[in-house]
Regions:
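Phosphate- and other anionic-substrate recognition elements at nucleic-acid/protein interfaces
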Residues: 1-31, 37-72, 76-92, 98-162
Length: 162
């Protein structure tokens, strides 16, 4: 993936923000000037809003978009990196209990694995992901570690999407 994501900005603040973001979500990247990036074969270019006007490609991410949920941005980047014919599938696995485990797979890659202790936090995260990620098929699987909590989570998710 190293040559598929390019940071293309001459703006110091934008550069710092972009590379810190990419490091935090553990994605590798190339660094090019905006002019060099125009002719590169990279699939995703991340740049500042001002410099984005020189690019005609559609796979541009502007540094201001990085303020969104990092999980959503990582998923958008991965989607731009995959082949168009790849089956678009989002799977969210939830393991209820005192500590609620969540594992999220998007386009066959695990993009997040997290443990939360608050049901409301779980519901907010799951609903945000289901709302913001495009996939032809979205699956939420809930384990039966704590059956009453599993039922509560299932009912809450179902009612939020009716």
């Amino acid at each position: 993936m190293n040559n598929q994501i390019t940071v293309a900005t001459l703006n110091g603040k934008s550069y710092y923000k972009i590379i810190n973001f990419l490091k935090s979500i553990e994605l590798s990247y190339n660094e090019l000037s905006p002019i060099e990036a125009i002719n590169s074969g990279t699939k995703v270019i991340i740049t500042s809003e001002k410099e984005s006007t020189i690019f005609k490609k559609k796979n541009i991410i502007i540094d201001s978009e990085l303020n969104e949920n990092p999980l959503i941005i990582k998923a958008k980047i991965l989607r731009n990196l995959t082949e168009p014919f790849m089956y678009e599938q989002l799977i969210i696995g939830i393991d209820p209990g005192k500590r609620i485990g969540i594992s999220i797979f998007y386009l066959y890659d695990e993009i997040e694995s997290i443990v939360l202790t608050c049901i409301e936090c779980v519901l907010n995260l799951v609903c945000k992901i289901l709302t913001n990620l495009n996939a032809k098929r979205k699956i939420v699987r809930i384990g039966d570690g704590d059956r009453s909590m599993a039922n509560s989570i299932a009912i809450n998710i179902k009612t939020r999407f009716k």
